[in-house]
Every structure is written in structure tokens, then in C-alpha cells.
Amino acid sequence: FRRVLFRSCLYVGLMIDKSGMARVMEFNARFGDPETQAVLAILDGDLARLLHSAAIGTLDTSTINNVANGMACCVVLAAGGYPGETRKGDEITDIEDAEGLSTGAVSVFHAGTALHHEPDGTTSLCTNGGRVLGITASAETLEEAIKRCYEAVKLVHFRGKTYRTDIGAKGLKQG
């Protein structure tokens, strides 16, 4: 084996099994999606500075524990038909209502979205298939982050919207 210097992020994909044990599913030298959205919501520091110092080999490992006190939850809103053939072109409304739910504690990350240009010159935000949006909420406790996240999920509308209703539930059982 050759020794290779690794300077990047390492994503560990975990799955909690039926017995409550965390199992490693995969390793990737990239950020996980949508897991990163939840991490970024509670990151207490400058992500660019952290990544730069890792890349040039000056990362102070004592700064890695720079996650703010709190918890986060991210729920993916997918287009109808996901994970198979998905709908496209459905107008997305009320994102602002979701983001305004709790000042600074709810973020909406775009994935499968597109702008549709109307003949009258107006534009509308539409689905573009697959994972459409990642709704992320943070709070002091996991229970409150999950509650806030699903409240925001209910405020965003588009035809065929689908999402899991159990995100974070296993974490609550562990706590």
C-alpha cells in the first residue's frame, strides 16, 4: 500500500438498524446530501476557513468541535413519482412562509428547482424532478427541531409533493 495524504472532508453514511445500532453504509470524500444541510444549520464558525485550513494542512483539531449547542433536522421534499420517474414543471409556492416560520432557524435549500419564464415576462419557481427542496430547521432540542421542520414542510406547496414523515424519529427514541 502507498501512503496517500488525505486532506478533504470525509462523509460517513450511517443507518440506524432495527436494534438501534448505527451501521456504516459508506464513506465518501465529499459532503453528504441532505445530511450536510443539517450540519451547516448548527455550525458555529466559518466553514470556508475550516475547509481551507484542512486543505493546506493547518487545521487545528481542537476547532473541529465547533458545532453550536442545538440540533437540526432536514426533510427532503421530492417531486411526485420519486425515486422513479418524477414530475417536472409544477409551481412551488409559499417558500417564504416556511423560511419566515422561525427567524434564522428554518432554511430552504434548492435542489430540483427551475425558473419558468412566462410569456408576460413573469417567472415562477417550479419543480424540476427528483429531490426538489431540503427544508432544514434548527432548535435547542431534537424534538423541537423536528417539529419546526415539519411545520415548515407543511407550508411549502407543489403538486405531487412527497416526503418522509419519520425523519429524526429514531434519534428521539435513542435520546
Q: Residues of each region from the PLM?
A:
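Short, small-residue-biased leader/transition segments that mark boundaries at the very start
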Residues: 1-5
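Interdomain hinge/lid region at the active-site interface
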Residues: 16-23, 27, 31
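A short glycine-rich, hydrophobically flanked beta-strand micro-motif that places a catalytic Asp/Glu
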Residues: 6-17
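Glycine-rich phosphate/pyrophosphate-binding beta-alpha loops
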Residues: 28-40, 81-83, 114-116
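Peripheral (often C-terminal) accessory segments that flank ATP-dependent C-N-forming ligase machineries
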Residues: 53-175
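Protein kinase-like catalytic core scaffold
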Residues: 10, 23-25, 131
